[in-house]
């Protein structure tokens, strides 16, 4: 009995491996529609594309929740929104020493990138609080020169974007979360996704590398995920984090059903085929939702991970992830 051939749509997508050029929207939609039995074939191609055209190795970063809760936006998945009723720790912006302590721990554990994250809509204009964050960044650069400092502070304006660019941050994170056409329905209606997209454009015009992706499992369909992939391609972001929803008690999505595993695998793999040369990062849901299958997703096109914990939920120990990254290297 001969080996069954690849599905024609998957065979056609092998052009990405040869040329490094991404697949188009129609091809991505065709792959997204294939049944689960083809998921591992798509994943295998995505892993080959990552190895040939990606940045090499597995990028790791860690974040600190430097200001927690009492956010006025109504994001349906988020424990930090004051519209929701989650039991989380709430505190104002921490001091520089607290940030330095966390950042030094990252350096000691071999994590190269460290992100300062704050709750809230963002900083359209310069403020005392924003100046404090700039001072934190300056101190990290001064005392930990090997550390790549990142930030995720919400929506920015021209002055605040320019100020961050002047501080030489490695990446700025702001996610579009879902396909822009369904943002108000699936994520939040207290602000528009265009405000986030304009922040990406502002930062890129100022020479800042942008980390921008989304979340899956919030009620979207595979077709919606493909549309998000192409919105990200139009924005030309550098790093693409993919979060798998971790339902949190007290949020509107606390009872959201788990996604079928084959859909998650296809989402990661097709993202790689649409973005063959970008860093694709597995963020939330890696340990808590995917559990035994997290390694499979890291072999489905992803080449980055968030380590050491998330904003309001625990992650895996950095030492465990360091061993995990070393094991993944054998597939490169």
From Swiss-Prot:
Instruction: Tell me which Gene Ontology terms the entry assigns under biological process.
Output: biotin biosynthetic process
Q: What is its EC number?
A: 2.8.1.6
Entry annotated with the keyword Ribonucleoprotein: no
Which Gene Ontology terms cover its molecular function?
2 iron, 2 sulfur cluster binding; 4 iron, 4 sulfur cluster binding; biotin synthase activity; iron ion binding
Q: Which residues bind [2Fe-2S] cluster?
A: 150, 211, 281
What Pfam families does the record tag this protein with?
BATS (PF06968), Radical_SAM (PF04055)
Per the record, the pathway is: Cofactor biosynthesis; biotin biosynthesis; biotin from 7,8-diaminononanoate: step 2/2
Q: Please list the cofactors this protein needs.
A: [4Fe-4S] cluster; [2Fe-2S] cluster
Q: State the free-text cofactor note.
A: Binds 1 [4Fe-4S] cluster. The cluster is coordinated with 3 cysteines and an exchangeable S-adenosyl-L-methionine.
Please, which domain of life does this record's source organism belong to?
Bacteria
Quick check: keyword Transmembrane in the entry? no
Binding-site residues, [4Fe-4S] cluster: 71, 75, 78
Could you tell me what reaction this enzyme catalyses?
(4R,5S)-dethiobiotin + (sulfur carrier)-SH + 2 reduced [2Fe-2S]-[ferredoxin] + 2 S-adenosyl-L-methionine = (sulfur carrier)-H + biotin + 2 5'-deoxyadenosine + 2 L-methionine + 2 oxidized [2Fe-2S]-[ferredoxin]
Q: Which residues form the Radical SAM core domain?
A: 53-283
Q: Which CDD domains match?
A: Radical_SAM (cd01335)
Q: What InterPro entries does this protein's entry cite?
A: Aldolase_TIM (IPR013785), BATS_dom (IPR010722), Biotin_synth/BioAB (IPR002684), Biotin_synthase (IPR024177), Elp3/MiaA/NifB-like_rSAM (IPR006638), rSAM (IPR007197)
Q: Which UniProt keywords apply?
A: 2Fe-2S, 4Fe-4S, Biotin biosynthesis, Iron, Iron-sulfur, Metal-binding, S-adenosyl-L-methionine, Transferase
**NCBIfam families, per database record:** bioB
Give the matching PANTHER family: BIOTIN SYNTHASE (PTHR22976), BIOTIN SYNTHASE, MITOCHONDRIAL (PTHR22976:SF2)
Function recorded in the entry: Catalyzes the conversion of dethiobiotin (DTB) to biotin by the insertion of a sulfur atom into dethiobiotin via a radical-based mechanism.
Query: How does this chain assemble?
Result: Homodimer.
In which family does this protein belong, per the annotation? Belongs to the radical SAM superfamily. Biotin synthase family.
Name of protein: Biotin synthase
What's the gene? bioB
